Amino acid sequence: MAIFRDQAENHVEHDRSIEDRRRHRQLVEKSIKENLGDILSEESIIGETKNKKYKIPIRGIKEYQFIYGANNKGVTTGTGEESRGDRISSDKRKAISNNKAGNQEGKDIYETEITLEELMDYIVEDLDLPNLDKKKYSEIIVESAAKKRGYQKYGVRPRLAKKKTVMCKIARKQGKKRALREIGEEAKIGRFPFREDDLRYYKVKKHPKKESNAVMIFIMDVSGSMDNTKKYLARSFFFVLSRFIRRKYNNVAFEFISHTTTAKNVNEYEFFHKGESGGTYISSGINAAIDLIKEKYNPGVWNIYPFYASDGDNWSEDNEKAMEAVNEISDLSNMFGYIELLPSTYSTTMFYRFKKEISKENFVSVTVKEKKDLWNAIKYMLSEELQEKNKE
């Protein structure tokens, strides 16, 4: 016997479009995360405002449908290990390749737009700042997020406590029923609208909290050996890192140092846009950071995170000084990060010497050989595993 169910009572549970929309949101978020590396490798990202938009390709979702197979004989069964979205067809027909015309249907691809601000939201999900140790005297009082502390009768509409408001209305209605019974009237109460007295709003209170003080020191080699591609990679690394940290933490100071054979403190705009030429003394940039730390940022009360980007091509007479400088700044810092860009020969760059001779646990080095390595380098520098390693 056929059974018919009335689905009109609850449209939400039987609305198929809800599941489609949920799958669509998942697909969009997955595509954005998969394309983060490509977005971060665009030169146009440096210096852009938070409203700058970037296009991301999204594969379309098709409705389920029955299609004709290859007319093969027999019936096949699954292994029981299939998951949603797996292709289980045994059809092995090959697509036309070598840029020749074919007769197979293509995949629907469309684009969605994401702003730089939204991009940072996705980066925040994957990255986290290395541990900010609680320095004894470096805590700053900042205002924390507002917390709900009870209810009140007056407030702004966004803070309306709907559940509490309904409960107040029900209590008033029950009170009216009791009053009618007491005077001998059992009249049925009809429509019972809300009144101003029923409204309840969340009482919000802000509590101050202490937040650790930190300084990020960005050091960049701008010598003649750092061509436009290398400088672009370095600036991309520092730009994304600075935007991420500013978004996630308050009261983080930034210092910018550029160097050739000599180093100088520059402002943020000059750091990301101005170029120079000349020889390379790696020690000059790191020593400038050391002097800055000793002058302004006492390691006993500050969390210090210097990051240095170079192609590793150093003047040979400066190599020993560079080694001494790296050891010293590592002793003064919570973590010192060294990023080597497009190294020509692995064994002849400073990355090789640093890796071999620097034994500091808080010294972290990575190489970026091409644009696509940039995202992985950022993730490695700021990974949670690295935090735990430094904490130990």
Swiss-Prot record:
Family per similarity comment: Belongs to the UPF0229 family.
Comp. bias regions, Basic and acidic residues: 81-94
Protein name: UPF0229 protein CPR_1333
Start and end residues of each stretch annotated as Disordered: 75-100
PANTHER family registered for this protein in UniProt: UPF0229 PROTEIN YEAH (PTHR30510:SF2)
Pfam families named among the record's database cross-references: DUF444
Superkingdom of origin organism: Bacteria
